[in-house]
Swiss-Prot record:
Its main location: membrane. GO terms for biological process: calcium-mediated signaling; cell chemotaxis; immune response; inflammatory response; positive regulation of cytosolic calcium ion concentration; response to mechanical stimulus. A lipid is attached at C329 (S-palmitoyl cysteine). The gene is BDKRB1. GO terms for cellular component: external side of plasma membrane. Belongs to the G-protein coupled receptor 1 family. Bradykinin receptor subfamily. BDKRB1 sub-subfamily. This is B1 bradykinin receptor. The chain crosses the membrane at residues 42-62, 73-93, 111-131, 154-174, 207-227, 251-271, 295-315. Keywords: Cell membrane, Disulfide bond, G-protein coupled receptor, Glycoprotein, Lipoprotein, Membrane, Palmitate, Receptor, Transducer, Transmembrane, Transmembrane helix. It is a multi-pass membrane protein.
Length: 352
């Protein structure tokens, strides 16, 4: 194929990745020239926003001198995962700018791609865990104990990070740099040792990392929404009902944003698998999949910088935590206005 997506670059051997007639399907040179010029700038912008935004989220969650609740434990881990992910984006921006000529050596080829692959699993598993926690809290509230949920959340997050790391081991082992004399580049590619690995990879990528988690997310959130509709009047009078509803609204927004950002990537990854096993063939499909994967990767990248924006504009309780942190870090002499006046200003400024 004409190019390779940053999240998963693969080849069984060089002849498959760069066939003799590879240029026969080069039907969109203008599109590729535009992509090589424009996409790196957007990726660096995403990296900058994601770095600052996720650092801000982690500071808001971790600086206050109190224990995190269950939702905050999951959201802090999601922010940490996004932060690690965006740290690898400048390398891929430079890679695309160089027309996929990897300049950073074999170690970073494996390390950066391994981290990106681990983040793919960690993020989706955290979204499942967050949805499952909301499901237990709202659909089965009598069986949900706060202390037990907090301990379970910590253990779950540790397991998710470990599993994500284990699932990225093939990427660490099979990634390598390879010279491509016809294109005069040295590419960072995933060297699959056997044709069967293509099938194993798509099972891992599309089923384990998307379809199964998607089924769980849809199940949990369907019952969450049904529970919220059925208990709307009760939740208004129940202690903490408004707080639970606000937190659930934030989490549902995060879930929708995650699926919108990542679904196109998995769709094009599946099309790429069909192309590799020759289920679909033609220059149209090759160019469509190549360009589509690049744009789908970009959309997936945006999710890591979008989450902090969602926290600020959807998460009212998060904004309250920001205000509390500001009061904690600001000397009283610098904030002489009355608390009621300050609260009024705060509510007017952040009103949705």
């Amino acid at each position: 194929m004409a190019s390779w997506p940053p999240l998963e670059l693969q080849s069984s051997n060089q002849s498959q990745l760069f066939p003799q007639n590879a240029t026969a399907c080069d039907n969109a040179p203008e599109a590729w020239d535009l992509l090589h010029r424009v996409l790196p700038t957007f990726i660096i912008s995403i990296c900058s926003f994601g770095l600052l935004g996720n650092l801000f989220v982690l500071l808001v969650f971790l600086l206050p001198r109190r224990r995190l609740n269950v939702a905050e434990i999951y959201l802090a881990n999601l922010a940490a995962s996004d932060l690690v992910f965006v740290l690898g984006l400048p390398f891929w921006a430079e890679n695309i700018w160089n027309q996929f000529n990897w300049p950073f050596g074999a170690l970073l080829c494996r390390g950066i791609n391994g981290v990106i692959k681990a983040n793919l699993f960690i993020s989706i598993f955290l979204v499942v865990a967050i949805s499952q926690d909301r499901y237990c809290l709202l659909v089965h509230p009598m069986a949900s104990r706060r202390r037990q949920r907090r301990r379970q959340a910590r253990v779950t997050c540790v397991l998710i990070w470990v599993v994500g790391g284990l699932l990225s081991i093939p990427t660490f082992l099979l990634r390598s740099i390879q010279a491509v004399p016809d294109l005069n580049i040295t590419a960072c590619i995933l060297l699959l040792p056997h044709e069967a690995w293509h099938f194993a990879r798509i099972v891992e990528l599309n089923i384990l990392a998307f379809l199964l988690p998607l089924a769980a997310i849809v199940f949990f959130n369907y019952h969450i929404l049904a529970s919220l509709r059925g208990r709307e009047e009760v939740s208004r009078t129940r202690c903490g009902g408004r707080k639970d509803s606000k937190t659930t609204a934030l989490i549902l927004t995060l879930v929708v944003a995650f699926l919108v950002c990542w679904a196109p990537y998995h769709f094009f990854a599946f099309l790429e698998f069909l192309f590799q096993v020759q289920a679909i063939r033609s220059c149209f499909w090759e160019d469509f999949i190549d360009l589509g994967l690049q744009l789908a990767n970009f959309l997936a990248f945006t999710n890591s910088s979008l989450n902090p924006v969602i926290y600020v504009f959807v998460g009212r309780l998060f904004r309250t935590k920001v205000w509390e942190l500001y009061k904690q870090c600001t000397p009283k002499s610098l904030a002489p206005i009355s608390s009621s006046h300050r609260k009024e200003i705060f509510q007017l400024f952040w009103r949705n």
